[in-house]
A protein has these predicted regions:
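Low-complexity, Ser/Pro/Gly/Ala/Val-rich intrinsically disordered tracts
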Residues: 1-67, 71
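Short, positively charged and aromatic/hydrophobic N-terminal segments
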Residues: 65, 107, 111, 115-116, ...
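PLP-dependent amino-acid enzyme catalytic core
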Residues: 128-636
């Protein structure tokens, strides 16, 4: 009995063990299945949400990204990381959200693992000082220093100015010439506006007449509907009142050089000031260099107007200081290549208008205030007048900085203009054109793209043909007799160079695009006058108008380009459009010119630009101190 009972107990134990093991196996299988289901659900969610997010972002920043480049396993790993984590990134990471998923982006992150692509935007800063102190921006390279960095160079600059009797104007004085010391103002009366005299530095502002006299208001014209075909008044300030070169680029040149001098970076006893340009900036740089006791070198494209080279030959003694590079207006890359070669010699100090943020500062402080003065003047007689837009073509984009002030203080839209034959911003396009001084086939580093409101493209043919209308008896007679344009308005049209005509046409197109009326003013600038393009009109007369330019030709040009200025090739920008244009600049500045990615990316932040724009009074204090050390005049 005992033996039999033991057998029964043993059998039951075996059954229990088998059942228990089976239950364990079932539980394990269920757990595994549950894990698989969870994983599949997560994957499906990531794919659905991720695909939607990428489809949205793919409309932004796709300009010219390079899918053909490979960077090895690091880039492939970065691509995998992006796919797995794209939706886990902070929703404030705009730079990642606005750039398409592509091999090139993976390459960027592999190269720059600490870049701003995967960081939240930097907080706005009240001034540039804290930013430069952290080393997050190369202030030295881009001319944004606010302290003396080389005492010996500084002392030699002081000595040079003392020896040559040079006083430097402040930005505040150029913005408001009534603040220029009375003794300097009195002395200017005896000095020709085109003379190589240091006192002409105090004429580098908008308040001159054609003879160098001081005006209470910047000289300008208000273009009326009889000419423009739109009800909105278009206010045009004349840039050919600036001294020496008859163009406002002389202001940009002074703005770029003076901070380098008062911080001790530029030494007139050791350096040559090299001015890369498509024309007027090089002339302005040579003029400013001469007035400030420096040696200037002009680097410009060989196909610029004959008048530009004739001017340079008069001002430059050494022919080696005029360097011609291949191409025409849009061949700025060839200028950069030449400057890279020149920079190998430490005696050459490159003052690149496309990267010198002082160019932006000068126009924001001086041009912006002058144009504001014009708007306020006209609002006095029309209290309901609104400032609808500031319209200006982009060469270096310096002039567009004036729009920053007009936008922040008066709500004006900022509309950039380029040549239709080289529509870089509008269509990521390329090509050659003849609107000299603008449209250089890239996005300048100093262009605040993310604060821009619109882009307009204008054909160089329109500018060439209207240049004939504005500067021939037949054309002017047609405007007054057949179109009813006031004689006083027609008399000013000789103050419009090619890019000036471009600005006016873009303003007309902007007014039509926005549906503006008589109480909506647009403001722009005539950067230079027709006197710089006589040779271009000669070429037109010998070529396109070889059979003659009469009333019929004038009427055809006006019908097509003024009356026919429509809303084609106009884009008002949203965030996607701004980021598309901003991202395009990466290929010039980071890939070609070696700008650090963080330095490039920080320019998305309007806090950065606010800090840049607040540098003018800081530099003014340094200019006052510099003048005091020379002992030439009080300078205040």
């Amino acid at each position: 009995m005992v033996v039999a009972g033991d057998s029964l107990v043993g059998g039951a134990s075996v059954v229990v063990v088998v059942i228990g093991a089976s239950l364990v196996v079932v539980l394990v299988v269920l757990v595994v299945l549950a894990v698989v289901v969870v994983v599949l659900v997560v994957v499906v969610v990531l794919v659905v949400v991720g695909s939607a997010a990428w489809r949205t972002s793919a409309t932004a920043g796709g300009a010219g990204y390079n899918t053909g480049r490979t960077e090895g396993s690091a880039a492939r790993a970065a691509t995998t990381t992006l796919r797995r984590t794209r939706d886990a990134v902070s929703p404030t990471c705009k730079s990642l959200r606005n750039i398409p998923p592509c091999w090139h982006l993976a390459t960027l992150i592999a190269r720059h693992p600490t870049s701003t692509f995967c960081q939240p935007p930097r907080r706005p800063r009240d001034s540039l000082r804290p930013m430069t102190a952290t080393g997050s921006f190369d202030a030295s390279r881009f001319g944004l220093l606010t302290e003396i960095v080389d005492q010996q160079s500084y002392r030699r600059s002081v000595d040079r100015c003392r020896q040559q009797g040079i006083v430097l104007p402040t930005f505040a004085q150029l913005a408001d010439p009534s603040s220029i010391p009375a003794d300097i103002t009195a002395s200017l009366a005896d000095i020709d506006r085109n003379a190589a005299d240091p006192l002409n530095l105090f004429r580098v502002h908008w308040y001159n007449d054609l003879h160098g006299g001081r005006t209470d208001l910047p000289e300008h014209v208000v273009l009326t509907p009889e000419l423009t075909g739109v009800d909105s008044p278009i206010i045009v300030a004349f840039g050919n009142r600036f001294p020496m070169i008859g163009a406002h680029k002389v202001l940009a040149a002074y703005a770029c050089l003076v901070p380098r001098v008062v911080t001790g970076q530029y030494d007139p006893t050791e350096h040559r000031a090299v001015w890369p340009s498509t024309g007027n900036y090089a002339r302005g740089g040579v003029a400013i260099s001469t007035l400030m006791g420096c040696r200037g070198v002009a680097v410009l494209l060989e196909n610029m107007s004959r008048e530009r080279f004739e001017w340079l030959e008069e001002w430059i003694d050494n022919p080696d200081d005029i360097i011609r590079t291949p191409g025409s207006e849009s061949n700025v890359k060839e200028i950069y290549d030449t400057c890279d070669e020149l920079a190998q010699d430490p005696a050459n100090f490159i003052l690149n208008q496309f990267t010198e943020f002082a160019n932006h500062v000068g126009h924001h402080e001086v041009t912006g205030r002058a144009l504001e003065r014009l708007y306020l003047h006209h609002r006095e007689s029309n209290p309901g007048l609104r400032l609808a837009a500031f319209v200006a073509a982009s060469g270096s984009s310096g002039t567009l900085a004036a729009g920053e002030r007009l936008k922040s203080d008066h709500g004006a839209r900022i509309v950039a203009v380029e040549a239709l034959e080289c529509p870089t911003m509008l269509y990521n396009g390329f090509g050659e054109h003849n609107i000299q001084g603008i449209g250089d086939k890239h996005i300048p580093l100093i262009h605040n793209v993310t604060n821009m409101d619109g882009v307009v493209a204008v054909s160089d043919r329109a500018c060439d043909e209207l240049g004939m209308v504005f500067n021939t008896d037949e054309g002017r007679t047609h405007l007054t007799g057949d179109r009813g344009v006031d004689d006083a308005v027609v008399a000013t049209l000789g103050h419009f160079g090619l890019s000036s005509i471009c600005n006016v046409l873009a303003a007309i197109k902007t007014a039509r695009e926005l549906g503006l009326g008589a109480d909506d003013a647009l403001i722009t600038v005539a950067t230079d006058g027709a006197e710089m393009y006589g040779s271009e009109r000669e070429a037109m007369a010998a070529g396109r108008y070889a059979t003659g330019f009469g009333s019929a030709e004038a009427a055809a040009a006006v019908d097509e380009h003024l009356a026919g200025a429509d809303t084609s090739h106009v884009e008002m920008l949203d965030e996607v459009g701004r980021n598309r244009i901003f991202n395009l600049g990466y290929f010039t500045w980071v890939e070609q010119q070696g700008v650090e990615l963080d330095d490039y990316e920080i320019r998305r932040d309007q806090g950065f630009w606010k800090g840049v724009q607040e540098l003018a009074p800081v530099w003014d204090d340094m200019i006052d101190e510099f003048n005091a050390r020379t002992g030439v005049r009080s300078g205040s």
